[in-house]
Amino acid sequence: MKEIVIASNNQGKINDFKVIFPDYHVIGISELIPDFDVEETGSTFEENAILKSEAAAKALNKTVIADDSGLEVFALNGEPGIYSARYAGENKSDEANIEKLLNKLGNTTDRRAQFVCVISMSGPDMETKVFKGTVSGEIADGKYGENGFGYDPIFYVPKLDKTMAQLSKEQKGQISHRRNAINLLQAFLEGEKNV
């Protein structure tokens, strides 16, 4: 069985990859390097994902997958972007990030936004590959729903007439930015199998 190493300490992400890649042995990097951490010094999701996957691939001499993701709000020139997890400051809660975003948007009528996920795959004998997924929506006027995490309670998906937090895990999994990026990664891996 082929192995996929995920350059993340986030068990939720690792579990998502395990479900999506049942034919692979999926392990988190902390199982191999307990204190692995890469400072995200890039200015884009792509740069940060590549920093993580290339550092992990070099440390392990193995093929590694990493991702970087976040929310971009058009009226805020793409904020919070790469700072999505720490928009209100280091170690602040999802609630604090949401509050800052809603306050900054105020009564702005242009509430278009997108979730972005960039997955990068690096290895010792390969050029780094990058796969980007997005999901478009709008920022709601308040929080709705109990599911999900992060900005899900305020990310409204017009075609479903619900926020991400009002969707079941299965519904969100079918349309999410991470799912879209993983679909591209899967297509690439399937193509590699058939070569």
Swiss-Prot record:
UniProt cofactor note: Binds 1 Mg(2+) ion per subunit.
EC number: 3.6.1.66
Keyword Cytoplasm attached: no
Cofactor(s) the protein needs: Mg(2+)
Active-site annotation: D68
Biological processes annotated in GO: nucleotide metabolic process; purine nucleoside triphosphate catabolic process
Catalytic activities: XTP + H2O = XMP + diphosphate + H(+); dITP + H2O = dIMP + diphosphate + H(+); ITP + H2O = IMP + diphosphate + H(+)
One GO CC annotation: cytosol
A Gene Ontology molecular function term of the record: dITP diphosphatase activity
Positions that bind Mg(2+): E39, D68
Transmembrane segments: none
Chain positions recorded as substrate binding sites: S8, N9, N10, Q11, G12, K13, S69, F149, G150, Y151, D152, K172, H177, R178
Keyword terms, alphabetized: Hydrolase, Magnesium, Metal-binding, Nucleotide metabolism, Nucleotide-binding
EC supergroup of this enzyme: hydrolase
RNA-binding is among the record's keywords: no
Superkingdom as given in the UniProt entry: Bacteria
Subunit structure: Homodimer.
Function: Pyrophosphatase that catalyzes the hydrolysis of nucleoside triphosphates to their monophosphate derivatives, with a high preference for the non-canonical purine nucleotides XTP (xanthosine triphosphate), dITP (deoxyinosine triphosphate) and ITP. Seems to function as a house-cleaning enzyme that removes non-canonical purine nucleotides from the nucleotide pool, thus preventing their incorporation into DNA/RNA and avoiding chromosomal lesions.
Family listed: Belongs to the HAM1 NTPase family.
Name of protein: dITP/XTP pyrophosphatase
Organism field: Staphylococcus aureus (strain N315)
